[in-house]
Amino acid sequence: VLVTPGKVPDSYILDSEALLREKGWIYLKGSKKEMREGTDGFTYRYAEGPVTFPDALNRASRTVVTGEGGSSPSRFKHVVKFKPTKGQVGRLGLTDAKCDEVRSKLNLGKTQWLRRLTPVELERLNGFPDNHTELATDGRRAFFMGNALVCGVVSRIANEL
């Protein structure tokens, strides 16, 4: 399903600031037990368990949802670890102290980093041919894949009917 690292646009590679900030990737993917306040002033205890982060490549994938597109941190977007190219490391500064902090928190190797899935990878994950949605923007492509039925499942149902 995954494309080679050199084919991953820089915009899909996560930056350390987005990972470490107060409501960033690490916070959103993690477990929470906290007090929250509703718009009417009512306070309540909010709790949720962690989401595997980064996504495990040796297990079945989570469902692609319509909010998969865009670069903003989200609990629901797929994030995978990968080995960036030397060019990506240099352009994005993936060797600074904040990147080392992220690697330490997430048990990443020295040459590993994190990225979101590209539109082609989302298409592959859902069983569509590469570039099935290429005429749309990347955000719309992700939305389409989040709104799609997995082709293999539909094909099997059709064959049984």
Residue spans for each PLM region:
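C-terminal target-recognition/interaction regions appended to catalytic cores
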Residues: 1-161
